[in-house]
Design a protein with these regions (language model features):
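Iron-sulfur (Fe-S) cluster-binding segments and ferredoxin-like electron-carrier domains
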Residues: 37-38, 78-92
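Beta-strand segments within the central parallel beta-sheet cores of soluble alpha/beta enzyme folds
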Residues: 92-98
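Short Fe-S-cluster ligation motifs
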Residues: 98-116
Length: 138
């Protein structure tokens, strides 16, 4: 079988799996080069929709935070819909947005004040140790 034939058959298998996963092949996947889709689909499926250490709802809330930071309307829409689909409430989505804003806010403050990074790293270690104590971990 030729390289082109192998890619086509792998591509057809990928499309079939995408249909099974989503119920259809989303239009945004159609312009993706066939050889790229064959390689990217298993990774997308595993880490975005499969079993993982991080529960699905929280992965989607993380994705939403990243999308909001990137100001990507496509990703924001997708991760909001997926988070809600996995049980996220409007309040959780709002809180994810707030946490995203807080990270950007404090990052701006630290950069604007040119806060000493080694000092910050030591302080963060102390904050982490304090959090462990409060959580009852050693």
């Amino acid at each position: 079988m030729s390289f082109e034939g192998t890619i086509m058959s792998e591509y057809e298998v990928s499309l079939k799996d995408i249909r099974k996963t989503f119920g259809f092949v989303p239009g945004f996947m159609k312009p993706v080069p066939k050889d790229v889709l064959v390689k990217q689909w298993p990774l997308l499926k595993k880490y975005q929709m499969g079993e993982s250490i991080i529960p699905q709802k929280y992965r989607e809330l993380i994705g939403l935070a990243v999308a909001a930071t990137l100001k990507c309307p496509y990703c924001t829409l997708m991760h909001t819909a997926m988070a809600k689909g996995y049980g996220a409430t409007d309040e959780e989505i709002s809180e994810a947005g707030y946490l995203t804003a807080q990270t950007a806010n404090w990052s701006s403050m630290l950069h604007a004040n040119r806060y000493d990074y080694p000092t910050f790293a030591k302080e963060v270690d102390m904050v982490g140790e304090n959090a462990k104590k409060k959580a009852g971990k050693k």
